[in-house]
From Swiss-Prot:
GO terms for biological process: peptide transport; protein transport; transmembrane transport. Its EC number is 7.4.2.6. Residues 14-788 form the ABC transporter domain. This is Oligopeptide transport ATP-binding protein OppF. The gene is oppF. Gene3D superfamilies: 1.20.5.1700, P-loop containing nucleotide triphosphate hydrolases (3.40.50.300). ATP binds at residues 48-55. It is a peripheral membrane protein. It comes from Mycoplasma pneumoniae (strain ATCC 29342 / M129 / Subtype 1). It is found in: Cell membrane.
Length: 851
């Protein structure tokens, strides 16, 4: 793997991301609470077999799939939840792009490459802002600068005509002379003549194609004179000076209405009102809007977990599994109950939800832990008891499930009754219910140990302690929210008091002062500057008019080159038609030597259409391309000229044509960055190879300058040599533009080569994560080891490949009483496994290096 300095600034933060798909009335869990972080500049790998959840993860990040739960943050923008804010939605479209395995997923076969690549710019409207700034900048230029720009614009177009058409005319004249020699020669057969004609035509077309770069260079240099003028700021009287004086005049006129002290007080009053408005908006965003978005995302996650547990309850006919899933459902519903207090808080921070979510899950789990643990134990022991006792165990399981319902209902009812949002746990209610169901003196022997465990003082003390911890968290949050509300109200009150005092002061100081002399002076100064500008315009106009005459003369003479081009093109066509006719006549003569008289007569009236015309027809289309490119370049030159030197109203009328030019130039830059030619912009996707189409898809993703690119099996359908080219392009672009890449792939060798960190996914979960070097050097998880063993290598060419083991049972023992977690592998920096402690000890001990 390529060594790369790690940047520790997190760009993507994924927490408990879940994705449920509804399939024929039931839910399929594609992602199951996955957590990972991608740092800025990472080439982050995601690997796993088909159906492991790799692509679903990428689609959730870009919201092609709306996550069912969890939190997704990209550059501090919340992307998860049912709906996005308008700001986050616009940011996501501009800064996160995805490239798919099949390029046609993002390429429309009915549109040319220029239209396809520019689509993200149209959606995000980023170019519109650039064009507006461009037009605003033009308004700041002085009259002298504009006239100089006009002269430079004509010079630029003249240079284009002279460079481009002088070379084109040379190639045309050379070819016409060659055709003239062929017309005079009689030593060639029809086949030789046809081959020579095609050869000369191909040479001409190839020579003309070599000159296309001048057209593209001219198109992209239209705004260069303006950029140069902005860099070399000329010290001439511009509109900015008048605008500043007018602003000063307006301020002085306002001062003339009141006294100097009153005017200062009025300014302070307006500033205080703005500060109050900004403070309220800031508090509403930070302590109300943003936290409630996170709250809704958390509740959505919990509700989808409830859907999942209810589905599991409905799909099973096993009493133990039914009871277990029903208890899990109650535990998750209790989380929804306690979340009600958030809705009553006037203000709270989003990190309260982050800090409390996991703790709430642990404590609600502890509240029902004893019941769930007993059900799991009963299920484990059920097969070992005698048949007479099994009925008692089933009855006892049903009793525990009803006891769980009773505990949940009691906690929910107590929480609803309390005005301060707290739970009230009473063991007496459960003991009374238990005594009504069973006679303690005649308790069946088979349930005796479970009974003692459930109704012991130690067990109820644990439950009471967990409930009290929940109450403490809630009361602490309510107290903190109350303090925040008090601080905010105090701050707002101080603003209002200050505003009232300033209003009173303003009334007492309102008496006006005499500013007539200052106002008159400013008006005189403005009039003098306007007079100077008019005088300067007259001087510049006469000077520039003289300087522009030779430029226009040279420009007009350059225009004759295009007329000469059209004349030579007609001459070329005439010569070509004569040669084609000569070749056909030679062909008829050669064919007619062996024909009968009747066949010769038929050939005169029904001549055979030769292949030469059809061959030339496709080649001569290139002249249409030259004409198209020329007219487009000249048309755009006219647009820039009108924008630079036309009336202000006319400039905004040319907003859309100018936008199209800006978009096209950005498309050219994107094509250049992926190693394609600018002329490819006018072709269609079906005219390219698979590797070229993938490059176009990458260019489309890069055009908005995103922070994150999701490469979903980018190279899986490409040849090995093309894979290397595409990956090298992506690596170079990532380094050049500081891109972060989420690289989803099957090819382990490619992931090992290009990625610096990775995660391994199986059945919607992350089973192993860390640095690429550490994982490939010492894979531990059985699934990871099976993937690596099944991966072909040239070093193992004489060894049979290991078959991939699909029957993994490592997750069969996971439950609420035996929860897996991420455990760090010894002697590593960030290598972690998702497993229980028992599995961790066993796998670490048995894991050996894979050669």
């Amino acid at each position: 793997m390529e060594t790369k300095k790690q940047k520790q600034n997190p760009l993507v933060n994924v927490k408990a991301l879940s994705m449920l798909f509804k399939v024929r009335g039931s839910f399929f869990k594609a992602l199951d609470e996955i957590d990972f972080t991608v740092n800025e500049g990472d080439f982050f790998g995601v690997i796993g077999e088909s159906g492991s959840g790799k692509s679903t993860t990428g689609k959730c990040l870009i919201r092609l799939n709306i996550p069912s739960g969890g939190k997704v943050e990209i550059a501090n923008h919340l992307i998860s939840g049912k709906k996005l804010t308008r700001e986050n939605d616009h940011w996501l479209k501009q800064n996160v792009q995805m490239v798919f395995q099949d390029p046609y997923s993002s390429l429309n076969p009915t549109k040319n490459v220029l239209t396809v690549i520019s689509e993200p710019l149209v959606i995000t409207k980023t170019v519109y802002g650039e064009v507006k700034e461009y037009l605003k900048t033009l308004a700041k230029l002085s009259f002298k600068t504009k006239k100089e720009l006009l002269r430079e614009d004509f010079e630029l177009e003249t240079q284009f005509y002279e460079k481009f058409f002088s070379k084109v005319l040379f190639h045309l004249e050379t070819t016409i002379n060659k055709f003239a020699l062929l017309q005079e020669s009689n030593n060639n057969s029809s086949a030789e003549l046809a081959q020579t004609i095609l050869g000369h035509t191909d040479d001409l077309i190839e020579a003309l194609r070599q000159e296309f770069g001048l057209v593209y260079e001219f198109s992209s240099s239209q705004s260069e004179p303006l950029q140069k003028a902005l860099k070399d700021k000329q010290e001439t009287l511009a509109q900015d000076t008048i605008d500043k004086l007018k602003q000063e005049l307006y301020t002085t006129q306002q001062k003339a209405k009141v006294s100097t002290q009153a005017f200062a007080t009025w300014q302070k009053l307006q500033q205080t009102k703005q500060n109050l408005k900004a403070y309220r908006a800031q508090m509403a965003e930070e302590l109300q809007n943003k936290p409630r978005i996170y709250l809704n995302a958390w509740l959505l996650t919990t509700k989808n977990y409830i859907k999942d547990s209810r589905q599991n309850t409905q799909l099973t006919d096993d009493v133990f599994a039914f009871s277990y899933n029903d208890m899990v459902d109650k535990k998750r519903r209790l989380v929804l109950v306690l979340s009600e207090y958030y809705k009553a808080l006037p203000y709270f921070y989003d990190n309260w939800i982050h800090q409390n979510a996991d703790r709430f899950d642990e404590l609600t789990n502890a509240v029902f832990f004893d019941l769930i643990d007993v059900v799991i134990a009963l299920n484990r022991d059920f097969a070992n008891v005698e048949s007479d006792a099994k009925a008692e165990l089933i009855r006892f399981v049903q009793f525990i499930r009803r006891l769980c319902d009773l505990r949940f209902a009691a906690l929910k009812k107590s929480f609803k009754k309390q005005t301060n949002y707290s739970f009230d746990f009473n063991r007496e209610t459960e003991l009374l219910y238990a005594n009504s169901c069973y006679d303690i003196k005649e308790l069946p022997q088979v349930i005796q140990p479970y009974w003692e465990k459930l109704f012991s003082d130690a067990n109820y003390d644990k439950i009471a302690k967990s409930v009290q911890e929940l109450n403490d968290i809630i009361s602490t949050d309510i107290e903190k929210a109350s303090n925040i509300a008090s601080e905010i109200n105090t701050k707002i009150s101080s603003f209002k008091t200050e505003i009232a005092e300033l209003k009173a002061t303003f009334k007492t100081e309102k008496k006006a002062e005499d500013h007539s002399a200052q106002i008159t002076g400013l008006k005189t100064q403005i009039a003098e500057i306007q007079t100077q500008i008019k005088q300067q315009k007259r001087e510049v106009q006469s000077t520039e008019k003289a300087a522009l005459k030779p430029v226009l003369k040279q420009y007009k003479s350059a225009l004759h080159l295009y007329k000469r081009f059209k004349q030579l093109l007609r001459q070329f066509t005439k010569q070509l038609n004569l040669l084609v006719k000569k070749q056909q006549e030679l062909e008829k003569i050669e064919e007619g030597l062996d024909l009968t008289i009747w066949e010769r007569i038929q050939l005169l009236f029904y001549p055979v259409e030769g292949d030469l015309k059809s061959e030339l027809k496709t080649r001569l289309k290139s002249f249409g391309v030259i004409n198209f490119e020329y007219k487009r370049a000249v048309r755009e030159s006219r647009v820039f000229r009108l924008v630079h030197f036309g009336h202000d109203v006319m400039k905004w009328g040319l907003f859309l044509p100018l936008t199209k030019i800006f978009m096209r130039n950005k498309v050219y830059e994107a094509l250049d960055s992926v190693g394609l030619k600018r002329e490819h912009a006018y072709r269609y996707p079906h005219e390219f190879s698979g590797g070229q189409r993938q490059r176009i898809a990458i260019a489309r993703a890069l055009i908005t300058k995103p922070k994150l690119i999701i490469a979903d099996e980018l190279i899986s359908a490409l040849d090995v040599s093309i894979q290397a080219q595409v990956i090298n392009i992506l690596k170079d672009l990532a380094k050049k533009h500081n891109l972060t890449v989420l690289f989803i792939a099957h090819d382990l060798s490619m992931v090992q080569t290009v990625c610096n960190r990775l995660i391994i996914m199986h059945r919607g979960k992350i089973v192993e994560r860390g640095s690429t070097d550490e994982i490939f050097a010492h894979p531990v998880h059985p699934y990871t080891r099976s993937l690596i063993k099944a991966s072909p290598k040239l070093s193992k060419i004489n060894i049979d490949l290991a078959s991939f083991d699909e029957k993994f049972t490592y997750d069969s023992d996971y439950s609420l009483t035996n929860m897996p977690s991420f455990l760090k592998v010894p002697n590593t920096q960030e290598h972690e496994l998702y497993c229980t402690q028992g599995q961790f000890d066993s796998w670490i001990k048995g894991a050996s290096r894979i050669n």
